[in-house]
Amino acid sequence: MLYPDLLTKKFKLNPHQLQQFDLYYRFLNQENKKYNLTALISLSDVYCKHFYDSLILKEILDFNQIQNVCDVGSGAGFPSFPLKIIYPNLKITIVESSLKKINFLKQLTVVLGLKNICFVHQRAEKHTLSYDCVLVRALGRLDLILKWCRLLIKKNGYFVAMKGKKYAEELKDSQHIIKKIKMNLIKINKQELPNQLGTRINLLFQTH
């Protein structure tokens, strides 16, 4: 099965969305060296380890019920840009410490024809606004990112930490901070990427 077809079958993409993912892949390949975005640049890696990996978040959270999302340390736009493609009404804020990556993402926004995306050149712990949902992918240790991001999440809001197979140790080491900052772990979602390309663990927390 071709990788675009894999996305279409799994996530019920329409032709316009499929075209947006194709543009995303091509633009990422074109600009990657200039902006030093990702080492995973092959067709299989981009579609499976970036696009697919981002979209499986829709299986743990109904983004139709979410108004605004903050993606911390988005890098090349993952996971928020793939989610924005299939949920065009989402309001996205990117908090990114690399100005170079923000410049790439601003261009990508135009290429994909996306709207309602804001960019903040700042570290997460310095940002002061709050959101319905905060997303973090491969940014650092769980206890640290929980502390950095807690104030960004509204009351009864959600926090998603995208982790790998070693999540259990990080989760164990984070119990004290989870209790201290008044968050509950409400879901652990394990997913296998296509073609045995890896295991993803997505942790869903809610504030109280």
Curated annotation (Swiss-Prot):
Organism: Phytoplasma australiense
EC number: 2.1.1.-
Main location: cytoplasm
Domain of life: Bacteria
Protein keywords: Cytoplasm, Methyltransferase, rRNA processing, S-adenosyl-L-methionine, Transferase
Underlying gene: rsmG
Binding site residues for S-adenosyl-L-methionine: 73, 78, 96-98, 124-125, 137
Function of the protein: Specifically methylates the N7 position of a guanine in 16S rRNA.
PANTHER family per record: S-ADENOSYL-L-METHIONINE-DEPENDENT METHYLTRANSFERASES SUPERFAMILY PROTEIN
SUPFAM superfamilies named among the record's database cross-references: S-adenosyl-L-methionine-dependent methyltransferases
GO molecular function annotations of the record: rRNA (guanine-N7-)-methyltransferase activity
HAMAP family attached to this UniProt entry: 16SrRNA_methyltr_G
Keyword Iron: no
Family named by the database record: Belongs to the methyltransferase superfamily. RNA methyltransferase RsmG family.
Keyword Disulfide bond: no
One term under GO cellular component: cytosol
Compartments where found: Cytoplasm
UniProt protein name: Ribosomal RNA small subunit methyltransferase G
